[in-house]
Amino acid sequence: MKISIKKKYRFLLALLLLLSILVVIISNFTIEVSARGKTFTDPANTPKNKVGLVLGTSRMLVKGGVNPYYANRIKATIELYKAGKIEFILVSGDNGTIYYNEPTTIKKDLIKGGIPDEKIFLDYAGFRTLDSMVRAKYIFGLDSVTVISQKFHNERAIYLAEKKGLKAIGFNAEGITGKQGVKVQFREYFARVKVFLDLLFNTQPRFYGDKIEIK
């Protein structure tokens, strides 16, 4: 019996869907396993590093109010610094327009939290996590770093960092539950697939630039 074109199409579509799901699962599992034992939630148990790398995000939500992901990263950074587990802070984020400047905004809030101005360095070209990790190594000359973000983000950042020759651990800012948290976690699955595409195609940061010494 001949298989109709419609049935062939459905079979190929189902196969493609299955393969896509497998890619997502494998990508997520690989990154999660790779980061085991490398992220921390208690400053007392967190190894010391010269530099803590804060990954930027928007301060305000689209619908108004402070972004809890942002607020929790600020809190975690201040906590880790005051515990003596980092000496300097590198803030890496998006500075794509004159109206949007993640690093400067974060720096202001860190200073309000008691961190000295001279201890904070800014990376204005951290448009993506990949950019932040590569630039930390090649622009700021770091061999090791403590990444500060939510756990799911730290895991991805650590995987990227190690693939780019940067030793990294993560200090986990508090996560978010509810609808907003679910939405972000869902997007994270696909962000992890993109990690492997970036590594496969050797994607480079948008900008490099002059070297900056953190001291």
Residue ranges and their predicted role:
Residues 2-43:
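N-terminal type II signal-anchor transmembrane helix
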Residues 1-9, 78-80, 86:
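Hydrophobic transmembrane signal anchors and adjacent membrane-proximal interface regions, especially
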Residues 203-215:
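Short linear elements at protein peripheries
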Residues 2, 6-10, 178, 182, ...:
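Structural motif marking the loop-to-transmembrane transition
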Residues 29-185:
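A structural signal for short, hydrophobic/glycine-enriched beta-strand patches
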Residues 173-174, 192, 209-211:
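Extracytoplasmic electrostatic interaction patches
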